Amino acid sequence: MAELQPLALQLEQLLNPRPREADPEADPEEATRARVIDRFDEGEEEEDDLPVSSIRKLAPVSLLDTDKRYSGKTTSRKAWKEDHWDQTLPSSSDNEIPDEGGSEAGDSEGLEELSEDVEEDLEDNEIPDEGGSEDGDSEGLEEEISEDVEEDLEGEDEEDREEDRNSEDDGVVMAFSGVKVSEEVEKGRAVKNQIALWDQLLEGRIKLQKALLTTNQLPQPDVFPVFKDKGGPEFASALKNSHKALKALLRSLVDLQEELLFQYPDTRYLVKGTKPNAESEEISSEDDELVGEKKKQRKAPPKRKLEMEDYPSFMAKRSADFTVYRNRTLQKWHDKTKLASGKLGKGFGAFERSILTQIDHILMDKERLLRRTQTKRSAYRVLGKPEPVPEPVAETLPGEPESLPQVPANAHLKDLDEEIFDDDDFYHQLLRELIERKTSSLDPNDQVAMGRQWLAIQKLRSKIRKKVDRKASKGRKLRFHVLSKLLSFMAPIDHTAMNDEARTELYRSLFGQLNRLDADHGQ
């Protein structure tokens, strides 16, 4: 009997009259044809749903339907979490054990309740065997349960102790971090004040440089009596006023130095006149408090009244006493910078000399240092000395090139004068560092200043490293000279070194005319 085809398959065959290719592996018999079934029964008994018993039908109605107190309400996840945490936090605090007595009482009550429950369970589940075994089992169960409860309580106590320790550790960490932050803030303020103080001292040094240049122009001892005789009372009054002003300036500078030395505990011995402490190190907080109390008692160093003749010896003694603190401070910061930079013991670092050895080595050649301070580096004229006469320039004829007089190199550095003090090289170095520091902290929005700084950096880079074209050697690159554009009727400027005859020979050799000329000359 032919199988009835579904309607969809019949319609598809009508719409597509092309005959379908038969599958050679398909089974024409319906009984033996492979087919897919929903479930294969292997003989297992199906567990049908059991009907509800009559006892369940007689059960009371749910409390949710009868009592409104047990009815629920819609809520959001966020509100549920907040209510959940609000409920769990007080419950955890209620479980805390106030003291040891209360904990022991609670443990005993919990053990009694558990033992009663175990006895009831044993009475309900009695086994009709030996009576002694029942008693032994119940006692063993009671002991095991009591041990488990004690272990649980001990574990809770340990967890509470760990939480307390963690909270204490968090407090210590927070306090430690707060102390660290406050220390860093204080260090930053100290560095800022130190930079401001350095800028003020440098500003005073710049103002004193003008006075130094004026002092170098004053008459020297060999001609000073002549100026004094010819100057008269006007010169004497001006000399007296300048002497008073100079004395007041020296007194102010000495007071400023003593005030700065007295404020710092490590240099206070210089003002008091006591011996320095060789084992002086960084001051602790307790020492700072003592120093603050002493400062309140004595806020200023003692005033000194010195005459002009006493200042040279006083400053020499002060400089010698300051050497101990200077050497100790230089060595300390030199070691710190070496450790911070990581250059200690690497390469030739073991052969490096200490900073104090280098300073002593430089100070050994005192004659050279004195000559550097007695060298006239600026253009000024000392009163009482004749002006330097420039060398006459030889006259040149109209057709001859102009010849300049030959001046030896560094001639201005050979102008020595023992009566002057000139440190323009050190002064210019200070100015250069000041300008670099000021320009490094420019406003990024100031495009003009940033452009100037960028040009200065580019100049320094071009001096440090020059661009070299390594491919231009051995004739691998064509060399040429760019001529400037001609303006209006301007004649071209010939920059080549070849003359007309050389050009003629070049062109003749290129086009083969040179050989013909040689042949004509030979005939």
From Swiss-Prot:
Phosphoserine found at: 62, 167, 237, 280, 284-285
Any one Gene Ontology molecular-function term assigned to this protein's record: leucine zipper domain binding
Binds POLR2J as annotated region, ranges: 237-279
First-listed, main subcellular location of the protein, grouped into a coarse class: nucleus
Region (Binds to TSG101): 447-523
Family annotation (InterPro entries): AATF (IPR025160), AATF/Bfr2 (IPR039223), AATF_C (IPR012617)
Disordered: region residues: 13-172, 273-305
Segments of skewed composition (Acidic residues): 41-50, 96-171, 279-290
A cellular component term, taken from the record's GO annotations: nucleolus
Region (Binds RB1): 280-335
Compartments where located: Nucleus
Recorded family membership: Belongs to the AATF family.
Summary of subunit composition and partner proteins: Binds PAWR, POLR2J, RB1/RB, RBL1/P107, RBL2/P130 and SP1. Binds DAPK3/ZIPK and TSG101. May also bind MAPT.
Protein's recorded name: Protein AATF
Organism: Rattus norvegicus (Rat)
